[in-house]
Regions:
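Membrane-embedded alpha-helices and immediately adjacent juxtamembrane helical segments
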Residues: 1-362
Length: 362
């Protein structure tokens, strides 16, 4: 078999031909079941739910240093089209309760409260790191201090990013009025808010893919496809799910007073599932090439510090984890059919058809 037709010498994802992408997507399809992506996402959802209130507490504490805490609800309405209605009710209720204490003042009490909130919210971030280890076929070997420092940095960066986004929404209207664009303010703010949300989400997910798993850092080009897939699909699925809950959802009829919470949990679970699948895509892309996909200096295979960078799919060393469609069939380990597989298979088939058509046109 011509190895170049499969992308074995690809230095970046765009150099992988259609045949190579077919193998990548087939393996991702199988890994959804093999890595129990939906079960892992459910576990992460649990930890994120536990981290939600401490995270909001830390957010409002820092937000209160610059703005009136009671105004935070007015500035988070941009999420109403993405977070399901029940989820927004839960978030708004918690924000109202936490903001009732008034404006934050610097002091020992504030520092202790913020530290406790960040530490509690940090458990949710660590669960995302573990999900990335699953996607990239890694085992966690970082010591307690290094892992905690990294996850705390992510947690604090996420909170600061949200505050910056809210700050833009607060400051921009005044600037637009000063330059004579007052009548277009509302429209510009709405468009700008969603663009800013997309940019921040992209940066956050790319950072998670790069520094979340316990491995040598991947080059940015080997992170980008999974990031783009995750952001677009999460935003699209979130909007569709919010619309479904608003128009057809019957969570309250089925679960009563727990309906809003169940809908919120389902939304988080869907988002985390998509995020892990994005990591699986990046992982399988690295398995497709024999070139070093980690940051410089270049290293020989076997000494790159990352399982998927040190392995090529379809080789004996790769094992069942990285088996190509041909070797999977011979070993009797073809991916099992499941709802998660089907949810991935339809868009994957459309993408394959597009890639093959583009290949023929060339």
């Amino acid at each position: 078999m011509n190895q170049s037709s499969r992308g074995r010498d690809a230095a970046k994802p765009s150099e992988i031909p259609a045949r190579g992408w077919k193998e990548i997507l087939w393996r991702v399809y199988g890994e959804i079941s093999e890595d129990r992506v939906m079960l892992i996402a459910a576990g992460v959802t649990y930890y994120l739910l536990l981290a939600m209130v401490p995270g909001l507490s830390a957010l409002i504490s820092i937000y209160g240093l610059f703005f009136d805490p009671a105004s935070i609800q007015d500035h988070t309405q941009m999420l109403s089209g993405i977070v399901p209605g029940g989820g927004m009710e839960i978030l708004e209720e918690q924000m109202e309760r936490l903001a009732s204490g008034g404006r934050t003042t610097l002091g020992l009490t504030f520092a202790i409260s913020l530290a406790i909130a960040l530490w509690s919210a940090n458990a949710g971030m660590k669960s995302l790191f573990e999900a990335m280890n699953v996607a990239y076929e890694e085992n966690e070997t970082r010591g307690f201090a290094k892992l905690t420092a990294t996850s705390l940095a992510f947690t604090l960066s996420g909170i600061v990013g949200i505050i910056c986004m809210i700050g833009v929404v607060v400051v921009v209207p005044g600037v637009l009025n000063l330059i004579g664009l007052g009548s277009a303010t509302e429209w510009l703010i709405r468009i700008g808010s969603y663009v800013l949300l997309f940019v921040i989400a992209s940066l956050a997910i790319a950072a998670l893919f790069r520094w979340g798993p316990d491995r040598a850092n991947a080059k940015w080009q080997w992170i980008t496809p999974g990031t783009i897939l995750s952001v677009f699909v999460i935003l699209a699925v979130s909007a569709l799910f919010s619309w479904y809950v608003a128009n057809f959802g019957s969570y309250n009829e089925t679960y009563g007073s727990l309906g809003a919470l169940i809908g919120f949990l389902t939304w988080i679970w869907l988002a985390v599932t998509i995020l892990i699948v994005g990591g699986e895509l990046n992982s399988e892309m690295e398995l497709q090439t024999a070139r070093d996909t980690t940051t410089p200096p270049e290293s020989a295979m076997g000494s790159r510090g990352a399982t998927v960078a040190d392995t090529v799919a379809g080789t004996p060393e790769a094992g069942d984890m990285a088996a190509s469609p041909d070797t999977s069939a011979r070993r009797g380990t073809r991916p099992r059919l499941s709802a998660g597989n089907l949810a991935f298979a339809v868009p994957a088939a459309l993408l394959l058809a597009f890639l093959e058509r583009r290949s023929r046109q060339r």
